[in-house]
Amino acid sequence: MVAIGLTALGLGILGGAGAGRSPAASPDLAAAASISPLASTGRTSTPAIAASATPSPAPPSSPAPSAAQPSPSPSGLIPADARAELERRLQATIDRARTKLAIPGLSATVLFPDGTSWSGASGFARVATKTPATPETAFAFASMSKTFTSAVILQLIDEGKLSLGDPAVKRLPAGLPITVDPRITIAMLLDHTSGLADYFLNPKIDPVLQRDPGRAWTPADALRFVGKPLSAPGKAWHYSNTNYLLLGLIAERATGKPLATLVRERLLDPLGLAATWYQAGESAKAPLADGYRVTSTKPTARPKDLADGSGVAPFRSVVTAAGGAGSLAGTSADIAHWARALYGGDVLGPIGTGILLSDFTKTRGYLPGVSYGFGVQALSIDGHPSLGHSGRLLGFRGAVRDFPIDGLTISVLTNQSRADPGLIVRSLLRVVSPSTVPAPSPRASGAPAASVPPAG
């Protein structure tokens, strides 16, 4: 795995200007609300073992189950009695968060420095049938899918099939219903500096998506909703799903394979991520939670089924329109292991890893305190630098954060698109306090040390 210099690490979220850019400082995350942590320790890296759901206290008006997936006995770094108490506190934290933020159901995973893991769940995967969420429940990854698309592109760069400076228009298939400025490069698509407008922000697209929720969209269908450019190429940072939809098409043309196949063959299968799949091109690999949206994050809020009345989300129209920008789904354990492998240097070669971890820019109008690189967000949480990505799609929201200095990885997936999962990540981080968990050994691999912008 890649060795990341401790003084070099500092995290951020979307966007970046291009190779050779000076990294920007990134302030600590300013939480909009707080969830009281229950204090303690933790970390893991092997898939958690399934456990039966156990009931958890909940308000009488909306009883909701919780399920914990204990890790194997640690190798000696954390005493067994301390680990049991730690896992109890982790479960209590997500139970409290689910109630406080009016989330129907959620799943979370923590990977510890000693190679063990914990996965837990709380609430319901399907409210109408009172189907409990478990660690094996899958949720839509939404924009966390961008980390997979970016990884495929960077692998192709490692292999010499693509270059960061390639004009995107020369790598895209012909006949797309969009004009791509010849100055836009692959690097600009990766770091959101292309200036292209986001098709999902076009107010005309939502009624069309919901009119026929079962329809499978093509990239061309989605690209018809791209508006006028927001800026000249390379001049400003604008988060845009259009960039990653185009990157998926570039990867397909460069290899002659569908993006679903590329993600499966290059990333999921080699890493053993069997409960993750590309929804736009594969069948489900795990039970998928229903998605919900609520009108309030107050504890008394009642989840409302989505527009089709079934509660099933996301709509096929939405996930197929998302393509390389947001079509994957999977478990909290899978996305946590993915993040650890990606940022640890186990997915990309030396060139790709160096690119991924070295080029960030501070963002505006996006997420507080976040800098963005080539499909990776950098963010300091309570002074702990992290790398990862967040995601939100109709009915779902989640986040994954890898803390290389602390040796921790934390993921949270929910089936409610309003509540901020970053608040739960922060609460879990406070529970697994690095001050009480033995420090991890430095990550090492044949890849060169990479730098991340210093946290501000």
Task: Give the positions of each predicted feature.
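N-terminal export and membrane-targeting signals
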Residues: 1-5
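Extracellular mucin-like PTS domains
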Residues: 34-67, 71-73, 451
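Short, conserved catalytic-motif segment at the N-terminal edge
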Residues: 82-139, 161, 384
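Short active-site loop at a secondary-structure junction
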Residues: 101-104, 128-189, 229-243, 323, ...
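Short, surface-exposed loop or secondary-structure junction motifs
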Residues: 124-126, 179-392
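Short, well-ordered beta-strand elements
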Residues: 386-389, 397-416
